[in-house]
A protein has these predicted regions:
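Short, flexible, glycine/charge-rich loop motifs used to bind or transfer phosphoryl groups or to couple energy/partner
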Residues: 45-53, 107-111, 138-141, 210
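Short low-complexity, flexible loop/linker segments enriched in glycine and/or proline
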Residues: 18-22, 104-106, 136, 166
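Short glycine/serine/threonine/alanine-rich loop segments
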Residues: 1, 86, 237
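Residues that scaffold the ATP/ADP-binding catalytic core of kinase and kinase-like folds
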Residues: 31, 68, 129, 170, ...
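Short gly/ser/thr-rich secondary-structure transition/capping motifs
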Residues: 36-45, 98-104, 131-132, 208-209
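Conserved beta-alpha-beta core of the PfkB/ribokinase-like small-molecule kinase fold
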Residues: 57-140, 147-149, 157-159
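Conserved phosphate-binding/catalytic region of the ribokinase-like
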Residues: 79, 134-259
Length: 259
């Protein structure tokens, strides 16, 4: 992992998430550290323009949008990445306990959705943002916010994707659930890596993303489903993420979910 642009803040701590899991593998985010966390102290002056010149994708979430200076720094980072031709990936990852109130969270996320080329949310977040869980509402949200690629993860059922030209549910995989922490992050990584295989050499990655065929998108989401599924077969977040060899073997031998 390249940590060239990692910044240490002597006055702040790394934000921690505390996760409680049941014997069935279901999880609940019990709490986060909230006071003097380094991620909330990111400033525009911390951003290195050279970093974006060599990048292909910028991925961000909504926690950095809760308050300044991180909110303005995040928006500036998106602008800088866009200027350098990066794809913008956004997983709002709603954590209401960190926000002053739910309405501020909803408003902020809706305002920031148009910044992104790729947005990933789950069914609970879809209902939070639109008032319902129907996939038709997801397609309406994509159109309203002009999002080139919107993905709704559906737990064991897989994931739904919608672009301007295509929409489809891609089935998930049958697994023995151990613990689900890190599944969403793994899914995001699978999507980004899959997209880059198709669009990284294009002079206009956003246009290349929009031109992907249904079969190409289906293959990308299937791979992402595989990464997310494998992340659920081990305890922990980072330790559960698979190697390429593990992923290839899983995709070639595993059965899709019957749900």
């Amino acid at each position: 992992i390249d940590v060239t642009c990692t910044i240490e803040d002597p006055l702040a701590q790394t934000r921690m998430a505390y996760v409680v899991t049941t014997s069935e593998g279901d999880r609940k985010l019990a709490d986060f550290t909230r006071i003097a966390c380094a991620d909330a102290r990111l400033e525009i002056e911390d951003l290195d323009e050279e970093l974006f010149a060599g990048a292909k994708v910028l991925h961000f979430g909504s926690i950095s949008l809760i308050e300044n200076p991180a909110r303005d720094a995040t928006k500036k980072a998106v602008e800088m990445a866009r200027e350098k031709g990066c794809l913008i990936s956004y997983d709002p990852n709603v954590r209401l306990s960190l926000w002053p109130d739910p309405q501020q969270c909803k408003t902020t996320i809706l305002q920031s959705l148009p910044w992104a080329d790729i947005v990933k949310i789950n069914e609970v977040e879809l209902e939070f943002l639109t008032g319902g869980k129907e996939l038709a509402q997801a397609e309406a949200l994509r159109e309203e916010m002009n999002i080139p690629l919107l993905i709704i993860t559906l737990d064991s059922r897989g994931a739904f994707f919608a672009t301007e030209r295509h929409s489809k549910i891609v089935s998930g995989f049958q697994i023995e659930l151990v613990e689900a922490t890190g599944a969403g992050d793994g899914f995001n990584a699978g999507v980004i890596r899959g997209l880059l295989k198709h669009v990284k050499e294009s002079p206009d990655r956003r246009a290349a993303l929009k031109s992907l065929e249904e079969s190409e998108m289906e293959a990308i989401i299937r791979t992402a489903n595989g990464v997310g599924a494998l992340a659920c077969t081990k305890a922990g977040a980072i330790p559960a993420l698979p190697s390429q060899e593990e992923l290839d073997r899983f995709l070639s031998t595993s059965k899709v979910s019957a749900n």
